Amino acid sequence: MSRVLLRGIQCHACRSNVIRSFISVSDVAITPLAGGSRSTAQARPPPLSRNFSSQHAKLFSNQPSDNAELVVDPIPEIHTGEETEGQPEESQEHIPWYLKEEQVEETIPHPLRKQQPLPPLPENPPPILENLLEHISVDIGLDNLSLLDLRRLDPPPALGANLIMIFGTARGVKHLNVSADRLCRWLRTTYKLRPDADGLLGRNELKIKLRRKARRAKLAKSAKSTLTQPDDGITTGWICVDVGTVEGGQFRKPEEELRKVGFVGFGTVVEGTRIVVQMMTEEKRQEIDLEGLWRQKLERNSLENEGLPQPQAAAPQEAGDIHEQLTVPPTNISHQISHATQISANYEQRRGISTGSRRYQDATSDTWGTSQISPNSETTHLEPSAPSSLTSLSHHFKNIPPHEAIYDLGQGTHDRCSTAFLQQFYQEVARAPSELASSRRIELMCIAIELHHPGYRKPDLFQAIQEHVLSNYALTRAQFLQILDAFLSFKPDLTSNPPRLLLPNADMELALQIIDHAGLRGLNLLDSTILVKLFVGVSFRAQVYPVKEKDLPNSPVIGNRIPVPLNTCDAVKRVQSRLTRVKTAAKITFTTEQYMRILRVLFDQGSYSEFWNTWEDMALAGIARDKALYVFLFQLHAESDGWQCFTTQLLNCIPMMERENPPVHLDGELAEVTQKCITIAYPEIIDRVERNEQNPLVRMWHRCRVAIENAAAAGGRGQDSTAPYVCNHSDI
């Protein structure tokens, strides 16, 4: 110890206490002073010396030393009362920093946590989840974090059972790639996991793509052009990081469901929880709305998996208010409840409850044409006539003119009582089972839209279909095709400027959404019927011919053909070409009627090359080109002009008719339309016939005239007017 320090302390007792306080650290005891020296310590030492000794012993001596009994400190015993009196003075004394007790400072939360709160943890979370959210929010810096617990989803998602999905927004494309890369590295080093990042480019791969993009941009700049490729494979804006299966947090199903009778499966039950992190840019997250789609799936699944209520006196209100509630006598209610089957809350038994509801309604109806049901009667003997009644009402429009059908349909979707038909229809709908009522209501709206009723709109039909689907009702193929026809139906407006000849984009979008939903339900979309409907739906609804945009105002109507912009016509042809390639790739075969619809569309828009290619494809596909098909061919050309450059192809079909299998002979009906086509292609044919020129065209005219005369003579004698005219091929 420094001598200067000891010299500064004049009191011997204080110097002894100072030395004792330092040496007590090494557990060395000091013998107390003799009695003679005790007298010198009668005076009270300075408070600093005592405080120094006591505080030092508290701070440094963790355990009592072995010689603690030999150490005697007489000063605290003598001056105990004085110390208690002098405590207020000690509190005012200056305390050095090394004598102050350390105070535990409150932990200050991270500033990013205030700006971006972490989503609450779900029930029974896996241990890694909290650290993962903390790392994603603070270290990586993703914003707007949200968490979806998909562990209760039944059936489980395609990513796997016991799934927890985390959504986060990156500040940009570069931040997105860096965040995904750092997250994968953190998971590998910290938890020894093997994450899979779908959409993440490796560092070398990203450098290569950026280098190639810069090279292409440089070449395009030197060529004075711009890069028009919309997707360069770099700026996807979406990376899905599959963390993998982690320990803990799995959802345990009740034992009753695990011991379900009749359940058959394979494989083993996967233990643990799978975590998936969806990283997206702000624009991509708003565009796809993946979080909203999963939330809808969760809400629908929670409704399906809830405990179903017991049968009650009043029928539950279905989605869309399709039918009204009925009041039933208590005897019938007790009878139905007593005969209801015991069911559990799953998908199949839910339809069982719906069946019970149908029987309950059928038994209480008085207008089905059945006798009054007694309380002791069996519900299995009921034969309701509601389906037949609704079916007859739906077929009512097939036997009346369109204007009468539009009148019977009333003012619109919400009109239910303005006409006698609507009153009867909705009375039957109120008594019918809910699923049948929903189907017939959709069918009625489809019929009205196909008739171009102004009060029935396609968005209302789409809403009715959504209610039908959310009610877990079936959607048959016939219903789907009828709905598709309604959305693709369109009445051209020739009076507008410019004329509206194409289906609006909004209607096509609704049709495509219905097609997507049908595909999710398992319906075959690579079908000739659907392909032809789409082919006709995207086409012009009148005969047109293309002109340049600048020449459109001065272009007249030629015959029946209306001028349309060249770029619009090219866009329609591109879509038709894609559908044709789909047909070829999927090896889809068309029927004769479907080929006729495609031929008419191609002829109306002036695609004559594609028209004759399709005509030849029919023969290659093995389609029998019979008389009806040839009449259709010549009738198309007889109704319009503009095809004169393809006259040779048309006239070559006449000798080809008798080479078909079976052969098609030239009769009166065929001869009439053939003469019309010859007249359009060669207006001077009458002069040539009068001059009796010797050429194939005149001989063909005479052959058609003879066939018409034979048909007229056969009709006058009461014989078949379609008797063929057979001639020698040398006459042609």
UniProtKB/Swiss-Prot annotation:
- The UniProt record lists the keyword Transmembrane: no
Organism whose genome encodes this protein: Ajellomyces capsulatus (strain H143) (Darling's disease fungus)
Q: Where is this region: Disordered?
A: 355-393
Question: Any idea where this protein resides?
Answer: Mitochondrion inner membrane
Name the Gene3D superfamilies for this protein.
Answer: Beta Polymerase, domain 2
InterPro entries to which the protein is assigned, alphabetical: Atp25, NT_sf
Q: Name one GO cellular component term.
A: mitochondrial inner membrane
Q: Which segments show compositional bias classed as Polar residues? A: 355-379
Give yes or no: UniProt keyword Membrane: yes
Protein name (database record) = ATPase synthesis protein 25, mitochondrial
The transit peptide segment here is 1-52
Q: Which terms are listed as keywords in the entry?
A: Membrane, Mitochondrion, Mitochondrion inner membrane, Transit peptide
Give the record's family classification: Belongs to the ATP25 family.
The UniProt entry lists membrane topology as:
Peripheral membrane protein
Any one Gene Ontology BP term: mRNA stabilization
Coiled-coil ranges per UniProt: none
